[in-house]
Amino acid sequence: MNGDLSLIENDEAPASTVGAATREAIKVGAKRAIAVNGFSRVRIADITRAAGKSPAAFYLYFDGKDALLHELLSDFESKLLEQVSAPPSPGEDIARHLANRLQAFWRIYREDWPIATAAFQMSMTDQQFARAWHTIRQKGIRAFAAMVRRAQAAGGAAGLDPELLASAVTSMIEYACYNWTAKGGDFPERLIDDKTAVDVLSHVILQAVTGKR
């Protein structure tokens, strides 16, 4: 019997430590395989090969590629909500807060860009992915709009619509992160380090929202 299958002797085994580790290995392998082949071309065999697992093990946890991507996208959303969408603390400088949240977003996107790219592409043709992607964006826009309103209370971004500004800025951030990490971006032969990326984006965003660097 396959080594992965032999670990599963009852319905509760997938929730075990071994089952959780196998599930996580498949998700990590999926990110690697999608980064190389793209979601539309990647095969289950590519994913399990990258994960060091058997195709049979894959189907113990996921019905197919779409189900796997939905779970990866849910993980991506959880990271964003926890690390990026947190509101400023009372008395926290808005510029510092924005810079810290941007640094977190860049780090998450750098690690999970295959998921974000795949989900965005699927949202063009699949209604479930379209709704999921829209929900993630709306949460991000609302969180950013709240920071814009706080900045406006301190004299920044005077007269601008907070939600439209938040939508414009988050769209710019998302595409810049995609463009700087994707193989087909503006700099395919260049590794853009964290500090350089965050410094450039922080300058642009803080100018737009607070009028200062």
Annotate each language-model stretch with its function.
Residues 8-14, 72-99, 116-117, 147-153:
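Amphipathic alpha-helical linker/stalk segments
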Residues 27, 99, 103, 138-149, ...:
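An amphipathic alpha-helix signature
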Residues 71, 85-114, 162-169, 198:
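Hydrophobic alpha-helical connector segments
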Residues 22, 26-34, 76, 80, ...:
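Short hydrophobic clusters on alpha-helical segments that form packing/core surfaces
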Residues 111-143, 163-164, 191:
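Short secondary-structure transition hinges
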